[in-house]
UniProtKB/Swiss-Prot annotation:
GO terms for cellular component: chloroplast stroma; thylakoid. One of its GO terms (molecular function) is ribulose-1,5-bisphosphate carboxylase/oxygenase activator activity. This is Ribulose bisphosphate carboxylase/oxygenase activase, chloroplastic. It is found in: Plastid, Chloroplast stroma. Its main location: plastid. Activation of RuBisCO (ribulose-1,5-bisphosphate carboxylase/oxygenase; EC 4.1.1.39) involves the ATP-dependent carboxylation of the epsilon-amino group of lysine leading to a carbamate structure. Keywords: ATP-binding, Chloroplast, Nucleotide-binding, Plastid. It comes from the Eukaryota. Belongs to the RuBisCO activase family. InterPro entries: RCA-like. Transmembrane segments: none annotated. PANTHER family: PTHR32429, RIBULOSE BISPHOSPHATE CARBOXYLASE_OXYGENASE ACTIVASE, CHLOROPLASTIC.
Amino acid sequence: GLAYDISDDQQDITRMGINPIMMSAGELESGNAGEPAKMCCLFINDLDAGAGRIGVCTGIFR
């Protein structure tokens, strides 16, 4: 299998002024069925591959 190192992404996110909090999906589950879910944010890695068309700089984010 492939190993993924998220440390570079965490550094980039921190530079943008965002404080990432890593957690497992199990931490979002409730022990009581029917209890409202907790709020979360989805981080999509490699977003520039699909949304990287910015003028003449296609796919380049630095």
